[in-house]
């Protein structure tokens, strides 16, 4: 069962895939037919087999749930706080009252996606049973729409409660979760306790765990640079995006008219844009209709932005990352962490061009393309605040010039997209991991470190909540089928 909206033409179309009986008649919604087979979790309090999981993001949580289904006790170490305490630290950051480097938009229970929109969508068609991921989210409280919407979305206001219920399930069935427990050495973890000595480790860190990458490199774990993307986050008035994407229809100009009814039915418009500039992709990333821009850094003296939407997606702003593809050969050297170092360099540069502590540098979109100073800035959803800055001058040329041409290309496709009503903020640098923890393609085990199973976005094998969750499931299944190390 699937529902998708095609708004490419003036006549909007809704595509439905429905479940029917043998004679082709749609099955009623209230028919006594289960939507899916619910999970069956075992009691693992006294399980003989244990597995350590580092990270309580989607990869780590779904790995833990899978282990419990198969009678293995998961022991999770999470550097950040549980979700309700994490929410308090994020509120302080939004008010410009300080950054907790261990509890923020990147670190803590649920991972980065918990407070950055909650999209349940993956572009990949080759990763496996995504539907099972959706079913588990639904089992723990996600709305029915996650089972059939083509671009399912939970929202940053709803996802924390779902994550909490996952945690409660893990603990109820005998798993362990240790918060505020950053792992600073794999070697020390393996010898910390006899009960852990022979346990496999599922490494499910997020892409912002730069200190963990450095620890892994120092301990001889095989790493390599991978392609990633960096750029800016852009924000338009949502009413303008509705007009452009719904072919001339507007959102709230007539509360009782067809435009308002349309938005009520299909929601605020989103977009997915891509072009090629000088051999590199330029594209929108994590588009958040009716959303907000948020401070997504995890280190002092750095400025990182991201986007999020609540479940109703009803703010007056539409934001999206606008990023440029960066290949390993674009960064000189052979250090596997050189992409990470480039990220950090640009984040520090954005901080220097903003205003301490976390006010972001910003420029009107058309001024950026035309190389002009923005004398003032439009209203913006970024709570810490924005300050005028010449992003066109200080962004690296291979990023800035491609973004300028990319914006022109997008305006040709959607006339009116390039406008000074829109504002760009720097920098969007955490769209994906710049490092890959090298693993065997069949067993998912580290090629250098027996018993280590890297997975998820931080390992460089996923991008987003659903693909990370599925990779965590796959890693757990590999642990389950492997012979226990005795």
Regions found by a protein language model. Name each.
Residues 1-115, 119-486:
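Residues forming the flavin
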